[in-house]
From Swiss-Prot:
UniProt keyword list: Amidation, Chloride channel impairing toxin, Disulfide bond, Ion channel impairing toxin, Knottin, Secreted, Toxin, Voltage-gated chloride channel impairing toxin
Residues with PTM Arginine amide: R35
Similarity comment: Belongs to the short scorpion toxin superfamily. Chloride channel inhibitor family.
Domain of life: Eukaryota
Domains: entry comment: The presence of a 'disulfide through disulfide knot' structurally defines this protein as a knottin.
GO molecular function, one term: toxin activity
Coiled coil: none
Any one GO CC term of the record: extracellular region
Species the sequence originates in: Mesobuthus eupeus
The name this protein goes by in its record: Insectotoxin-I5A
Free-text tissue specificity from the UniProt record: Expressed by the venom gland.
Disulphide bridges: C2-C19, C5-C26, C16-C31, C20-C33
Length: 35
């Protein structure tokens, strides 16, 4: 898990990807990085 994901933030998917170094996505309330 990289960071929490908030459905109210329209940029959350991008922030999650950036937090994961370009490869990650929101899954429920968590930002999960793809290894």
């Amino acid at each position: 898990m990289c960071m929490p994901c908030f459905t109210t933030d329209p940029n959350m998917a991008k922030k999650c990807r950036d937090c994961c170094g370009g490869n990650g996505k929101c899954f429920g309330p968590q930002c999960l990085c793809n290894r």
